[in-house]
Amino acid sequence: MKYDYLIVGSGLYGATFAYMARQSGKTCLVLDKRPHLGGNLYCEEIEGINVHKYGAHIFHTSNKEVWNFVNSIVEFNRYTNSPVANYKGKLYNLPFNMNTFYQMWGVTTPEQAYAKIEEQKAEMAASLAGRGPQNLEEQALLLVGRDIYEKLIKGYTEKQWGRACADLPAFIIRRLPVRMVFDNNYFNDTYQGIPIGGYNKLIDGLLDGVETKTGTDFFREREYWEGLSDKIVFTGKIDEFYGYRFGKLEYRTVRFEEELINTPNFQGNAVVNYTEREVPYTRIIEHKHFEMFGQKVYDCPKTVISKEYSTEWKDGMEPYYPVNDERNVSLYAKYKELADRENRVVFGGRLAEYKYYDMAPIIEKVLEYWK
């Protein structure tokens, strides 16, 4: 065999696997059907700004081994994710914390905020008269009450899923963290940041010295590619790997409307969520804020924004999020059963495992494999 590993997909799972294989003295060939490497982490430089072409990616972890690993490839900056929600022209800090409650009700102490939330939760509990929540709407109202739900959850969630909250299963929202402190840091993790110079630096570092082929569809000449190696690492759609034998898994996808604007600072923050149903996009990303902090944003006279629209996935579109309803979960279980019987194929990543992944757990999983 020509290679120890054939790796299908050069996203974070594939690239990290290739790096670890090479460190262990193994040979790899990495294929990607896109014209570039990096999967959804790919960035394009526009006017000196690294634009996240497939949506905002913010690295965060409490795992020191993973943090040291990525920083050994490329240095990360101090970016802290602190999104803002825009509801009908009023701004609210996220995640839900004392700043949010002050903006919503004018409360200034944790005791006042707690009382307000408990009062609204009790109203919902009373209306359910002892039965459990039947859908996402009831679940959210039980967790945080009507004001937070109506202004910051309902419209955003309905846009994300393309259906009413009353028609979505309750399990989608198991908990909604409420912080009784003035803290806009979205993540609880010890470490977070963005690679200095963008995510391409991370991917290029992981794939340094590895043979790669872009613009190459594994399924077009499957037998040829499979013949090059004893072991295959597959990071694409698991249902496609098995020829959709049991039917197609469903996804949500995201459409991006990118705009280069002749102003140095469009919204003053990397991420602004638009939480009312009537605004068609879910959020606007202003990319320069991921790597330029404070007044430094004015050193670059232009800015790039991306409006994100969540839509139903159809063939030919990029699959983003798995739809974890009963039908898809049981369908995936059938494919997983086939995958578990494979000796020569490793399935890894969000498409091959049909699950939503943050970046750090993907790296953890690969490091674990090589231990």
Label each PLM-derived region with a short phrase.
Residues 22-47:
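Glycine-rich FAD pyrophosphate-binding loop
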Residues 318-371:
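C-terminal catalytic lobe of FAD-dependent flavoproteins
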Residues 12-13, 35-37, 99, 158, ...:
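Short, solvent-exposed loop/turn segments at secondary-structure junctions
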Residues 24, 219-338:
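Mid-domain catalytic core of redox enzymes
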Residues 3-30, 370:
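N-terminal Rossmann-like FAD-binding beta1-loop-alpha1 element of flavoenzymes
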Residues 77, 211-215, 346:
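General small-molecule cofactor/ligand-binding pocket signal
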Residues 90-92, 99-230, 235:
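Active-site/ligand-binding neighborhood in enzyme catalytic cores
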Residues 47-123:
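Dinucleotide-binding Rossmann-like beta1-alpha1 core, especially the glycine-rich loop
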